[in-house]
Amino acid sequence: MKQSLAVKTFEDLFAELGERARTRPAGSATVAALDGGVHGLGKKILEEAGEVWLAAEHESDDALAGEISQLLYWTQVLMTARGLSLDDVYRKL
């Protein structure tokens, strides 16, 4: 049986980002991104969405999964910046 690595869930990531926003550890890229504001985060999300599309067209499934994970990360950072909860988004699914 193949052993898998520990998996971080969507909820785990959101909790981790919230903790970083609250504790503001020195040198945290998440804190720097939050401090950069919604405009910068929006630009990053557009960049990552483009990379997802390109990976879907031209890359392996593994590379695509990596790009999607980055898009999810930056989307959650934006959610944190705006004060949205996971439930705010889940209600729209």
From Swiss-Prot:
GO terms for molecular function: ATP binding; phosphoribosyl-ATP diphosphatase activity. It is found in: Cytoplasm. It comes from the Bacteria. Its main location: cytoplasm. Its EC number is 3.6.1.31. One of its GO terms (biological process) is L-histidine biosynthetic process. InterPro entries: HisE, PRib-ATP_PPHydrolase-like. SUPFAM superfamilies: all-alpha NTP pyrophosphatases (SSF101386). Keywords: Amino-acid biosynthesis, ATP-binding, Cytoplasm, Histidine biosynthesis, Hydrolase, Nucleotide-binding. GO terms for cellular component: cytoplasm. Pathway: Amino-acid biosynthesis; L-histidine biosynthesis; L-histidine from 5-phospho-alpha-D-ribose 1-diphosphate: step 2/9. It is an enzyme of class 3 (hydrolase). CDD domains: NTP-PPase_HisE. It catalyses: 1-(5-phospho-beta-D-ribosyl)-ATP + H2O = 1-(5-phospho-beta-D-ribosyl)-5'-AMP + diphosphate + H(+). Belongs to the PRA-PH family. This is Phosphoribosyl-ATP pyrophosphatase. It comes from Mycolicibacterium paratuberculosis (strain ATCC BAA-968 / K-10) (Mycobacterium paratuberculosis).
